[in-house]
Amino acid sequence: MNQAIHVNSKNLSGPGHWSDMDMMEVGNPGMTVTEQASHFAIWAMFKSTLMISTSIPAANSDTVAILQNRDLIAISQDEAGLPVSLVQRFTNDRDVYAGDLANGDKAVLLLDLSNITR
């Protein structure tokens, strides 16, 4: 996931043209609930297709809650179709991304990419 967010997709997506950051891993083994929520937020903010790759009938309540986040789904489906872009790197593992939405609002994504629980 860390490599996927460093790809500059700003000029690769827009209305009718969407990024493809590959499969979403939400609900699959290998990530904590917090990591899964971050993963979903990254896919939504970068306007990648939100293609679910886990078994819906087997999904637990945390997975369902993440996949039903209406605010992130709305950002993903915003008609401007513009992904967020890096606006500030505070250290090697903390980034701030922002992007414009069709209604004039800004979508902001704060990421801590370290492997340390804070």
Each language-model region and where it sits:
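Carbohydrate-binding surface patches
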Residues: 43-46, 51-53, 89-118
